[in-house]
UniProtKB/Swiss-Prot annotation:
It comes from the Eukaryota. Its cofactor is Zn(2+). Zn(2+) binds at residues 19, 22, 34, 37. Residues 21-59 are annotated as: Disordered. Residues 21-31 have a biased composition (Basic residues). Binds 1 zinc ion per subunit. This is Large ribosomal subunit protein eL37. GO terms for molecular function: rRNA binding; structural constituent of ribosome; zinc ion binding. Belongs to the eukaryotic ribosomal protein eL37 family. Disulfide bonds: none annotated. GO terms for cellular component: cytosolic large ribosomal subunit.
Length: 90
């Protein structure tokens, strides 16, 4: 069997699947580990460089919860119904 173009056509099985912890397509089925977050190790895998850390830090995704919290904090949590009821009691 040759080791060139002909053998590359046979590489059609998938080795990676979605990771349970980080959700990326980097969980290797044969190695049973995620190349992105290090799952199943209890500690998260540390990205090597500062640039890589910047890519995956807080503020790079959708930030559904944080966006709402930052806006509410800026306005003094005036629109929060739970806090409004607490202030009404006092």
């Amino acid at each position: 069997m040759s080791k060139g173009t002909a053998s590359f056509g046979k590489k059609n099985k998938r080795n990676t699947e979605m990771c349970r912890r980080c959700g990326r397509q980097s969980y290797h089925k044969q190695k049973n580990s995620c190349s992105s977050c290090g799952y199943p190790n209890p500690k998260m895998r540390n990205p090597g460089s500062i640039k890589a850390r910047r890519r995956r830090t807080i503020g790079t995704g959708r930030m559904r919860y944080m966006k709402r919290e930052l806006r509410a904090a800026k306005n003094g949590h005036k629109g929060d119904p739970i806090l409004r009821t607490l202030w009404a009691k006092n």
